[in-house]
Regions:
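C-terminal motif of bacterial Sec signal peptides marking the signal peptidase cleavage site
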Residues: 15-19
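Bacterial signal peptide processing site
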Residues: 21-24
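Basic- and aromatic-lined ligand-binding clefts that recognize polyanionic substrates
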Residues: 52-54, 58-66, 174-230
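A short, structured surface patch at a secondary-structure boundary
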Residues: 59-116
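Extracytoplasmic ligand-binding site segments that recognize negatively charged/polar headgroups
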Residues: 78-83, 131-133, 148-162, 197-223, ...
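Proline-aspartate-enriched helix->loop->beta-strand connector
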Residues: 114, 118-126, 143, 251, ...
């Protein structure tokens, strides 16, 4: 009887060990899983649940919204390509996110810091076509995926949705976009109740070519004003374009009731002395809302920034003040 009991105990132990050996102890969606996705280069295998993402595609805000683990980013200032934008500074500090260049190519060096990227030992690199020249070098460091990119940043929703597809987070993306659209609709209704169908134009004093201006339509602040807040474009605002570079004489074509005007210091400067500026309807009525170039460049093109800047633009109108 004793021998039989010992034999049974032995068999139980053998089967238990065999079961443990045959069981996959890696949880579903673990860091060791990979998924094949389609990007601008074709098909590529990437981690399904990456733990050390280096983003040089300008998608850090979207990745953080999706609670992805970003260790380094190129979401730096569109002006100097080095400093962290004000609305991201706390997040970067809290999460220890390193800076490795600028996603738009605006860095003063013109390049990504490949050496630093390699030192960080990422398990995934997300890039855009602006850095295509270093694709092979990035791919040698870690699996590298290239987001579909229209260069002009108008397709920010499409890029966000592509991230959701890659990482099985489509529902989270759709929820964020629905909340964003609801907020935009609420602000648009408040503005409409106050000013009705009065018209708008969005100008930027060009920081590079002195004496010229951007007039926006579908890009950045133009998208926020016309497409999200549903405000009416003035006569003279171009259609079906990101924006256009114009000179001061173009002001004579604008018949806007309200103007957003962005410049490096947030004032009209020498533009305010021009007769053609003084003759515009919005200027005469005192309906000019001034904003700072760096702020709108850093906030009006990516998800978190858009949500914040949308409210800033709306508040400028509702409070009849500047974009602050």
């Amino acid at each position: 009887m004793k021998k039989f009991a010992m034999l049974m105990l032995y068999l139980v132990l053998v089967f238990a060990l065999a079961a443990c050996a045959g069981t996959d102890t890696t949880p579903q969606g673990s860091v060791s899983d990979t998924v094949t996705v389609t990007d601008m280069k074709g098909e590529v295998a990437i981690p399904a649940n990456p733990q050390r993402i280096v983003d040089v595609a300008g998608l850090t805000e979207e990745l953080l919204i999706l609670d992805m683990k970003v260790i380094a980013s190129a979401n730096t200032s569109m002006f100097d390509g080095v400093s962290v934008p004000k609305h991201l500074a706390t997040l970067f500090a809290e999460r220890g996110i390193e800076v490795v260049g600028n996603y738009s190519g605006a860095s003063s060096t013109g390049d990504l810091n490949l050496e630093k990227i390699a030192e960080l030992k990422p398990d995934l690199i997300i890039m855009n076509i602006r850095h295509e020249k270093v694709y092979e070098q990035l791919a040698a460091i870690a699996p590298t995926v290239m987001i579909d990119d229209d260069i002009s940043y108008v397709n920010w929703r499409g890029r966000f949705k592509q991230l959701g597809q890659w990482f099985d987070k489509e529902a989270a993306v759709e929820k964020w976009l629905a909340d964003y659209d609801a907020k935009a609709a609420e602000l648009a209704a408040r503005i409409r109740d106050m000013i009705g169908d009065e018209t708008f134009a969005v100008f930027e004093a060009n920081s590079v070519h002195f004496g010229s201006y951007y007039i926006y339509r579908s890009g950045g602040p133009g998208e926020l004003v016309y497409d999200e807040l549903k405000l009416t474009p003035s006569a003279g605002v171009p259609e079906n374009v990101w924006g256009e570079v114009v000179d001061a004489e173009y002001f004579s074509l604008i018949d806007a009731d309200h103007i957003f005007f962005f410049s490096d210091d947030g004032r009209a400067g020498d533009t305010g002395n021009l007769a053609v500026w003084k003759n515009m309807k919005a200027v005469k009525a005192g309906n000019v809302y001034f904003g700072i170039n760096e702020d709108q460049y850093n906030m009006a093109f990516t998800a978190m920034g858009k949500e914040l800047y949308l409210e800033k633009l709306a508040n400028a109108i509702l409070n009849h003040g500047d974009v602050e």
